[in-house]
């Protein structure tokens, strides 16, 4: 352990230990001169964590000085999470992709071949968590580390990170950890959800914007989550409202065959059905969890859909994420925490409040249903699968869990459109916030080049005034003095 005054220079001159020995990752903590107890780290200590022999993650409490053999960089103000409330991460899929490309480019750069690459973050614990998330994803995706190996590298010693929370207003009693996120990424790669070789960054960043449709793929070629359309396109109450026609051509191009609406009717379903889509309504209240009947209905529709399924509620966050998560848990046996982590990486804000605990509660039963589903399909030819679905679904209803059979439950009262007041629900607030936030970001991006252009024009005008008016007068005066 070295003091701050000697830490950086000595590290820069030293050779980093390779991280192929993953069971004992290396860490350097730079202690303050006043700290004497080696068992506890001062919160203001700088920390360096070895990722590979050339790559490190650093938590620094003062900006590092450049060196000839060390390249420092930070993404704290470059890849920023756009929060809804007190949520702060994890960063979305496009940011993970951008980060991985950045690291690969730096490691392969001819000008940096002899340099150590240090990704540093500052004192903000939320930024630290997102920096660790990005580095961990890079280890899992490009270095072939297991989630546990990546996580162990990041928490070596007493280094810790705050967990991620949901987008709900108020207190939070459910969190997802970095390890949950790494497991989600690993399983997404395993099941083909995540493949950066075919990832379309431009498409992701275009369509996730509120003004361009506010949609994200959760499972490529299978599930889209998007905000609820309205009867006509307009800008109202601070957010963009899109009509069904906005989505029809894109859905057709991407082989979407089924639309599932989870909120009250804001548009005529005929807009989609007349265009050749199947359209289904499964209403339940904004911010609530679905009944077993709704979960079963959703799974039945998805398992019988010929193509991709586009799901929406009002904001395309809470209800939408919850039911898509149920499908993922049933058919891919991911845990509730892993599933929540994955859907939020794809579309930040998904699954809100009590819907998180609902998924934890449903995990075991959904796994059992998935096992039963697979057993029924096993041994059957592909051509027989479709005919087997109705029988399978009726069989799933009779599964017994912990010795208690699934019996018919009393249906809830029909959902009323009056349960959602225009402009007053959680979904309204979330989508309005997202739309205003992105509009502000776009305005900033537009303002920067305009400011540069304005400054350049002002310089030209000033130079023109000097050359055409002031300079001749000065020359005339000087000539007069000379004579």
UniProtKB/Swiss-Prot annotation:
GO molecular function: protein serine/threonine phosphatase activity; protein tyrosine phosphatase activity
Biased composition (Acidic residues): 408-421
UniProt cross-references to Gene3D superfamilies, sorted A to Z: Protein tyrosine phosphatase superfamily
Region of interest called B, as start-end residue ranges on this chain: 212-378
Region: Linker, residue numbers: 198-211
CDD domains referenced in this protein's UniProt entry, alphabetically: CDC14_C, CDC14_N
Matches recorded under Pfam families: DSPn (PF14671), Tc-R-P (PF22785)
Alphabetical keyword list: Cytoplasm, Cytoskeleton, Hydrolase, Membrane, Nucleus, Protein phosphatase, Transmembrane, Transmembrane helix
Active-site feature positions: 313 (phosphocysteine intermediate)
EC number(s) recorded for this UniProt protein: 3.1.3.16, 3.1.3.48
Transmembrane stretches, start-end: 444-466
Start and end residues of each stretch annotated as A: 43-197
Domain comment (free text): Composed of two structurally equivalent A and B domains that adopt a dual specificity protein phosphatase (DSP) fold.
Recorded family membership: Belongs to the protein-tyrosine phosphatase family. Non-receptor class CDC14 subfamily.
Additional remarks: May act as an autosomal functional substitute.
Function per UniProt: Dual-specificity phosphatase. Preferentially dephosphorylates proteins modified by proline-directed kinases.
Protein name: Dual specificity protein phosphatase CDC14C
